[in-house]
Amino acid sequence: MSKKNPNLEDELSLFQDAVKGVKKFTHDTIITRRQQNSKVDKAKVSSKETQNHEFYFSDEFEPHLNEHGPTQYARTGVSKYEVKKLRRGIYVPDMYLDMHGMTQQEAKRELAAMLAACIKESVSCACVMHGIGKHILKKKAPLWLAQHPDVMAFHQAPLEFGGNGALLVLIDIPER
């Protein structure tokens, strides 16, 4: 036994009467698909970025750095006492760069930008925190820094500035 609501039938007939003369609407809007970046485009962008930063740092060049003991470097003509001041934490960094979680290309770009900012702002000491992790950036950061013409010296940072996971960098600021 089915019970039909007479109100439903009335409402349905009212609706059909209301839409009796309506014509079907034709759709004239064109839907365009978004172009997806292809892998080729991404490869071109990353190769351009690589070329821009190869000016500052090369992955093939490896300066002679002491493999035993803390990571340190002094450019020719820089006093060993300057390196000693870095080791003791006498130079306090005014600018910090944290490279945790960065790729090598990102780290190169940020390191170059930090050195340029240090020169622009006349900051003579900076701290580069490469972290310990898988030792990739820990090995690469000193090699890159030793190639930069404005880096006078660097030394593994004292514990208060990061210890094994950081370097204090002494930067040559040109006189204005």
Curated annotation (Swiss-Prot):
Residues 97-172 form the Smr domain. InterPro entries: Smr_dom, Smr_dom_sf, SmrB-like. It comes from the Bacteria. Keywords: Endonuclease, Hydrolase, Nuclease, RNA-binding, rRNA-binding. One of its GO terms (molecular function) is RNA endonuclease activity. Its EC number is 3.1.-.-. The keyword Repeat does not apply. SMART domains: SMR. One of its GO terms (biological process) is rescue of stalled ribosome. It is an enzyme of class 3 (hydrolase). Belongs to the SmrB family. Associates with collided ribosomes, but not with correctly translating polysomes. Acts as a ribosome collision sensor. Detects stalled/collided disomes (pairs of ribosomes where the leading ribosome is stalled and a second ribosome has collided with it) and endonucleolytically cleaves mRNA at the 5' boundary of the stalled ribosome. Stalled/collided disomes form a new interface (primarily via the 30S subunits) that binds SmrB. Cleaved mRNA becomes available for tmRNA ligation, leading to ribosomal subunit dissociation and rescue of stalled ribosomes. This is Ribosome rescue factor SmrB.
